[in-house]
């Protein structure tokens, strides 16, 4: 695959054989971003789990202290009073059977979903659409709830879901290139702590196998997976 001149120039600044500290990786991510817009900073983590086994699935939610730099569009499956609460809380799309029908017709202009428990039978009709995209409401992530206003507010404020894929990889957004290094590292630290906290007891051996920082359309920056503490020591505010 042919890379752009800007990408190649950025890649030349990165030693692919090194393991950078998270702080140095955050600096490089900001320095090597080659897009003209405010690029997203993403972290890819290879976990030492076998997600084909139910007792080694890794999933959860975390509230990033500085958000992701993007206001996610939230769709809520609710009716009556709960629908009104969701709308008041800032949900972008609210509905019941009508929303299910729109999604069946191809509507997917949202980044997260929330549902009240009584709507889940209806949402089940579109599980094959939402599930593969990581958009299915789930009690384990707190997105099947009667407290729709709080959950919508949390998502809008920076709460993200994470889930390991079939290859054992997990992807999280920790901010934008415009964020300070301190903000990126604080978000990374909070997310990493939660990922470590939910380590399956059945997972044996090394849990954090590989960590890579990257910006949108930018080269990967290898990060030392053993650096999980005191990440902010030298970070400027």
From Swiss-Prot:
GO terms in the biological process aspect are: regulation of translation; translation
Q: Which UniProt keywords apply?
A: Repressor, Ribonucleoprotein, Ribosomal protein, RNA-binding, rRNA-binding, Translation regulation, tRNA-binding
**Would the keyword Membrane turn up in this protein's UniProt record?**
no
Q: Which CDD domains match?
A: Ribosomal_L1 (cd00403)
InterPro entries attached here? Ribosom_uL1_bac-type, Ribosomal_uL1, Ribosomal_uL1-like, Ribosomal_uL1/biogenesis, Ribosomal_uL1_3-a/b-sand, Ribosomal_uL1_CS
Record's keyword annotation contains Ribonucleoprotein: yes
| Pfam families in the record | Ribosomal_L1
Name the domain of life this protein comes from.
Bacteria
Q: Name one GO molecular function term.
A: structural constituent of ribosome
Record's Gene Ontology CC terms? large ribosomal subunit
Family, per entry: Belongs to the universal ribosomal protein uL1 family.
* Subunit composition and interactions: Part of the 50S ribosomal subunit.
Q: What role does this protein play?
A: Binds directly to 23S rRNA. The L1 stalk is quite mobile in the ribosome, and is involved in E site tRNA release. Protein L1 is also a translational repressor protein, it controls the translation of the L11 operon by binding to its mRNA.
Q: Which NCBIfam families does the record match to this protein?
A: rplA_bact
Name of the protein in its database record: Large ribosomal subunit protein uL1
Question: Origin organism of this chain?
Answer: Parafrankia sp. (strain EAN1pec)
């Amino acid at each position: 695959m042919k890379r752009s001149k800007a990408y190649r120039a950025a890649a030349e600044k990165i030693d692919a054989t090194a393991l950078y500290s998270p702080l140095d990786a955050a600096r490089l991510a900001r320095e090597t971003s080659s897009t003209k817009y405010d690029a997203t900073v993403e972290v890819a983590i290879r976990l030492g789990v076998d997600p084909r086994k139910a007792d080694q699935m890794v999933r959860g939610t975390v509230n990033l202290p500085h958000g992701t730099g993007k206001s996610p569009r939230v769709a809520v499956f609710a009716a009556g009073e709960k629908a009104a609460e969701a709308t008041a809380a800032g949900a972008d799309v609210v509905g019941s059977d009508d929303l299910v029908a729109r999604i069946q017709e191809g509507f997917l202009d949202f980044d997260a979903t929330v549902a009240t428990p009584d709507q889940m039978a209806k949402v089940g009709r579109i599980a094959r659409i939402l599930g593969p995209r990581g958009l299915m409401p789930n009690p384990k992530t707190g997105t099947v709830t009667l407290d729709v206003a709080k959950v919508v507010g949390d998502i809008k404020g920076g709460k993200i879901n994470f889930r390991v894929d079939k290859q054992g990889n997990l992807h999280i957004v920790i901010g934008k290139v415009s964020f300070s290094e301190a903000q990126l590292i604080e978000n990374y630290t909070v997310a990493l702590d939660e990922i470590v906290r939910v380590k399956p007891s059945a997972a044996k051996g090394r849990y954090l196998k590989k960590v890579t920082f990257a910006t949108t359309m930018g080269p990967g920056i290898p990060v030392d997976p053993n650096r999980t503490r005191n990440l902010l020591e030298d970070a400027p505010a």
